[in-house]
């Protein structure tokens, strides 16, 4: 090969390598600088492990059995929870650490954490028995986080990260299950589901406004799942050996979600520079329930842990048997989805977020 041809070939290879490198960087570039998580057990990645007052902890097997190292670290699933899945799909990080975790790294502070607490809800009453950290108290942790972030990157950069971070909120089922359906203490004050839904939406409104005042701008709010299809609710309302979804509770979920869809644009219009997205988790879950074979599920009416009818938190423990194939169950315990289900839900929410960014 002549010298001139060698030079041309070398330039071609160099250009190709640079192009491939740019393309790779483009695909792995995080869509947000950080992810900040608030809510309940669906997004609690271990805060309750370090919250001594609560009885709701998932720091024992079989929780976490399919995580690297087979380590139970506070996630209410056999593996990742939805907050991890979303963070991974958006190229932010593989696992979202809990804020209360001791010795959390500077890098994890900078790229985001979870403030969620299993057992929490928008209604503080939801945490009375479990002593979980209510959603209303999670901004206190967030304020401590902001102070730590400023100490790492400085005031200006910290606020830039928070302004551009993706905020994900997942809460609500505990409020209705613990206060209205199974333990109807709130029915004395709110006789109809409509009244209690309005109360919860008002609490949500105040919560997101507080986050906005602290610098959050990109806020994703999860709707309710089909609550009547949670195994524990099917058990609570079971009248014979056959198990069916509780249709009224599903209808209530749909009604609440419709109200939330209407509410979020109203909040956004009143908060300059804010961007709100309703995350639809109802439809993907219902599709999995109605068309299980499409997703590789063989069981959708009970969890993988124990009988699958009641077991959750301390009732799902190292002495409890689990199903042989974890990925063919929609639910891991009587309330929480399996990692396989969270992955499918995550795909759906990821598509929503990407469409939202482009809009």
From Swiss-Prot:
Gene Ontology cellular-component terms listed: extracellular region
Location(s), subcellular: Secreted
EC primary class: hydrolase
Residue runs in coiled coils: none
Entries under InterPro entries matching the protein: GDSL, GDSL_lipolytic_enzyme, SGNH_hydro_sf, SGNH_plant_lipase-like
Gene3D superfamilies xrefs: SGNH hydrolase
Source domain of life: Eukaryota
Main location: secreted
Any Pfam family the entry gives: Lipase_GDSL
Residues annotated as the enzyme's active site: 41 (nucleophile), 333, 336
Keywords: Glycoprotein, Hydrolase, Lipid degradation, Lipid metabolism, Secreted, Signal
Any one GO molecular function term: hydrolase activity, acting on ester bonds
Positions glycosylated per UniProt: 103, 325
Signal sequence, start to end: 1-28
Entry EC no(s): 3.1.1.-
UniProt record, GO biological process: lipid catabolic process
Family from the record: Belongs to the 'GDSL' lipolytic enzyme family.
Protein name: GDSL esterase/lipase At2g30310
Source organism (scientific name): Arabidopsis thaliana
Lineage: Eukaryota, Viridiplantae, Streptophyta, Embryophyta, Tracheophyta
